[in-house]
Structures are given as structure tokens and as C-alpha cells.
Amino acid sequence: LLVIFCLTGSLTRAAVNPKPFVVPELKQWTGKDGNFTPGKDARIVCTSQNPELLRIARMFADDYQQMFGQTLSVAQGKATPGDFVLSLSADKKLGEEGYAIKITDRVAISAPTPTGLYWSTRTLLQLAEQNQERSLPQGTIRDYPDYPLRGFMIDCGRKFIPMAYLQDLVKIMAYYKMNTLQVHLNDNGFKQYFEHNWDKTYAAFRLESETYPGLTARDGSYSKKEFIDFQKQAVSNFVEIIPEIDVPAHSLALTHYKPEIGSKEYGMDHLDLFKPETYEFVDALFKEYLEGDNPVFVGKRVHIGTDEYSNAKKDVVEKFRAFTDHYIRFVEGFGKQAVVWGALSHAKGDTPVKSENVVMNAWYNGYADPATMIKDGYQLISIPDGLVYIVPKAGYYYDYLNEPYLYKEWTPAHIGKAVFDEKHPSILGGMFAIWNDHVGNGISVKDIHHRIFSPLQTLSVKMWTGAQTGIPYETFNEKRALLSEAPGVNQLARIGKKPELVYERSTVAPGSTSDYPEIGYNYTVSFDITGAKESEGTELFRSPNAVFYLSDPIRGMMGFARDGYLNTFPYKVNPGEKATIQIEGNNCSTTLRVNGKVVDEMNTQKLYFNAGKDSMNYVRTLVFPLEKAGNFNSKVQNLKVYNYCVSKP
């Protein structure tokens, strides 16, 4: 009998569901046996008429339908087996963002706040998308973050980032419970790439300005209305936008517009802190976006920059500290909390700078020693440059972050070499960042996304779950491949889960459309072509993000354009010529083969400046467009699209 009991007990324990995989990892899980599978008449039942509760229920229903094709009706009343039940209920231990889920023959979701309730729906969607039955393991979840601020900073100043991408980025961040996006709205290139001439050096300010018409960049900007709408969309997804106007350094866009406020001593990317006109100009600029009942800057925080100003002389250090204090108080005058880049160890001086209720990006300990800043009263965002800065193809910082190290070793309590207690009350949380330092380096928005999506997943774990990760990185890395970017979002342009032929057509008719807008890295596109006379600018395919030319607009060669860059192969199809064309693309190169032979492998190219003293890596990648065929005369047949590089399976 004892043997039978032991065997039975072992079987019972084995049947208990282990902690399910989601990103970020769940804090607490109590497993039961069995699964919940929603029936065809499954509903989302709301336990009250709270407007936010109903809105979140509708968002959950919309996302569920978009991801899985099943409509969940939103109802009130008594729940039955197979239903999802949403309620707002007090639970102090869950905090501002926590939630609880009990999965039995129904799914009971509760949270003390709408934020926590929304995060719970992200967890349920991730659980459901990992199996075809959309089943959920029975058990109880209690989940809450270690750090209240979990974010990312994107440099839109040096490279224009389209609003459509920013909107998708918010959805992606929300899907992984990342709640803060800092949008860097102005910056400039490095003058060594522009003949060492500040007047020729690229600079951009990305917001519409009525106070200073002509300040706004002409190669890409956001209207006030679309930026307001964007921030409100983010709020509806429980993501805060922190807009940043970077002054008094990184300010060449401002001095291009008004040269007299530029510093002759420290460079025209520095504002002259000794001129009253500088303050008049910057006051009016901030005021434009802060004043009124419906200001352009919607959220509770505004970033005033203060990054990397010269500390060459004591008088300029004191002026910089006074400038910083002035704009902290200036934005506070409009009811906003000020955010600054850490600089006050670099600019060590006597002039007091307000610290109470001020947030600081702790990015480099030489610029702002975190222990000193905490002692002085600042609230820190951990964003250590040596660990979490991405600068694409620059040759310094990271091109791709070291995710295994970050997953195993880092939390926001690690700021450079300084290590603090986990959940330190003065460390709000963490961010990572992408800086587009090298203007003109060929990097596309798709390349940027390829660099940030994976670490966004990894760092969401380290900012939510903190040091208590329960699975090894290798397991995490394998399992996250099952997850989407977000409901309805596929910026990576992934098609299919395993390496295979994902699309084919016997004939491509001019003007026809395909089942997919584009395919991302890695891919192979091949087709047979019988050439005909084509005018320059003839397209083979286009998508919202790129064009592939049979005959490019400049030289009539085969090539492609995206993000304002045109890249051409040394090849064109002549009238009457028959050829088999193959294009392979990955995150480093784009390769053209004709009849099985490599014509050109467009990998990273080195550009030289100033008689070879300076150089820049130029990237020639392509997420291949498929959405619509062009109006070509040639005959295109036997189109095949693979989601891997055929030459390197």
C-alpha cells in the first residue's frame, strides 16, 4: 500500500502545471492540474460598469480577435465556465501595477488599478499564443514589478523615426509591460562628417513650431496634433511618453535657426549661456509646448536635456548649473516633473540645482556619480552607457546589446560599476537607448527595430522581475521565439515559424498585390525574368517602407531604396535577356545573384572623410518589399520567397 501511495503521490505532483512562460517572467505562480480552453461562446465578463474596466475589456477583446480570429463578447452579469472575468478590487500587496489571475474552468482576473488589469491581459494573450488551442494552464498568478519605471529612449533627432513606427513601438512596449518611452526630439551630427563646418552639419528639430517657423526639420517632423494624439494613444496603452528637448548642448538645430545664440567658444552645437537672448529663445520654445489647457506635451514629465555641455571653465560650469536649475523650475511652473541627463559631477560647482522631485538619467558615472546624486536628492533612471547604449555600426558602444550578460547580471540597481540595493527607493527603474550618432550611415528604421526588439524583451524581464529570474537565458531565448511583437504588429516582417518556402507565384502581373507587405531578415527572393525596355524608375515591388527597382531612377540599374537611401547593383536586365534572379538579405548585407553567380554582395561599406582621417560604416540592408508589383514591361515568373538565406541554410 505504501508503494502504491508513493507512486500515486508522485504522479499527482507531476501533473501540477509548472510556471508558464511569459515575458516578463511571472513573480508568483501556484500550479494546479489541467488547462482552461475558451469555448466558441467565451465572453469577457465585467463585474462593474467602471469605464476603465469596460475599456480594457474591449481592448482585450479586440486584441484577442486580431491575434486569434475569435470574437469574445464583452458582457456584464454572472460568469459561466469558459468565460474571462475582469474586476477591479483592492489588494495593497499588488501595488500600482500588479494583478492576480486565477485560472480554473474560467479565468478570474483582478487588479487594484486599471494599469494592473491591462498588464494582466498582456499576460493572457502571451499565454494563449503559445499553443494552437489557446489554452491556459490552470493555477494562480500574482504578478507585480520590482521597478515602477521600465523604459526605452529613442533618438529621433539625428534620424527621423516615422510616427507609424512610434505608434507600433508603444504597442510593443505595452505587450512586454514596458511603460516609459523617452523621445529625443532634437540633435545633430558630428561636424567631422560635414567638412568640419557647423553650418553644413546636419541638425534637426522634429516638432512643428509656430513660435519659430522654420525651426522644424524639413526631412521629417511631427505636427502638434499627431504628437498629441500619439501621447494619448500611449496613455491608453499605459505607456508614458517623456518628450525631450535637449539643451544647452546638442542644440545645433536651434543655432542654425538663430545663430546669435550659438557659442563661439565651445561650438555652435552649444548654446551661449552668457546671452540673455538664449534664455528668451528657449523659454519661448518650451512654453509653446507646455502652456494652455491642452498642451502639446501631454504627460506628467518633460525632459530638458542638459547632456554633455563643456566644463572647460568654472564660469561656464556655474552658468550651466544655473541654466539647469532655471529650466527645471520653468517646466515645473507648468505642472510638469523635470527630467535631466546626469551631468552635475562633470559640472561640479557652487550654484545650487534643484533636486527635490527631479528625475535624472544616470548614464555615465563620470558625469553624474549615482551615489552622490542620490544623496543630493535626485530620483534616478538607470541607463548605464557601457551596458545599454546602442549606436548602430558606430564602432563604439554596442551595435547589438550583450543580452546574455544583461539577463544574467544586470538590473537597474547596477549603474556602471556602482551597485545599489535592489528596489532602492531612489532608483525609479531602468531604460536602454538607441543613439543615431552617425547621420548618413544607411541605417534604416527596420535596422533600428532589429537592434531593439530583442533587448526590449530581455530588459523587460530585468526591470519587472529584477534579479529573481527563474529560468536560464538559453531557455528564455528559445521560448520567446513563440511570442509576437504585439497584437497586429510585425515590424520585423517575420513570415512563418520554421525555415521554409513561405510564398510563391507562377506569374507576377504588373500592379498586382501579394499576401505579405514585406519579408524581414533572413530571406531569399528569387524569380525568373525575361527583360523588356524599362524606363528609369521602374519598380519591381514596393511596400510602405521600401522599393525594389528593376531600373533605378538615376542610372537604370537594379537596386532598392529605403529611408531616403538609394543602393544600386552593377547589373540591369537588358531587353530580351532571360535570367534567374536571387536576392538574399540579412541584417548585415543584401546579395544579388544572377543565374547562380554572385553579382554583388552589399555588405557594410567604409566611407572616408577628411583625407582618410575619419570614417563611417555605411549599411546597405533591405527588408524586401512585396506588397505591390510595379508597372513593368518585363515578364516576371516563378516568384519564390523563403524565410531564410538559401545559400546559408
Give each language-model segment a name.
Residues 44, 64, 113, 152, ...:
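Conserved, mostly hydrophobic/aromatic
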Residues 150-154, 181-183, 241-245, 300-304, ...:
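Hydrophobic faces of well-ordered beta-strands that scaffold small-molecule active sites
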Residues 157, 186-190, 246-250, 307-309, ...:
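Active-site beta-loop-alpha junctions enriched in small/polar residues
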Residues 352-358, 365-505:
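Flexible, acidic glycine-rich loops studded with aromatic residues
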Residues 93-270, 277, 283-301, 436:
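Feature activates predominantly on carbohydrate-active enzymes
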Residues 4, 12-145, 338-347, 354, ...:
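Acidic, contiguous N-terminal accessory segments
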Residues 254-359, 363-379:
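Active-site neighborhood of glycoside hydrolase catalytic domains
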Residues 495-649:
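Extracellular glycan-associated modules
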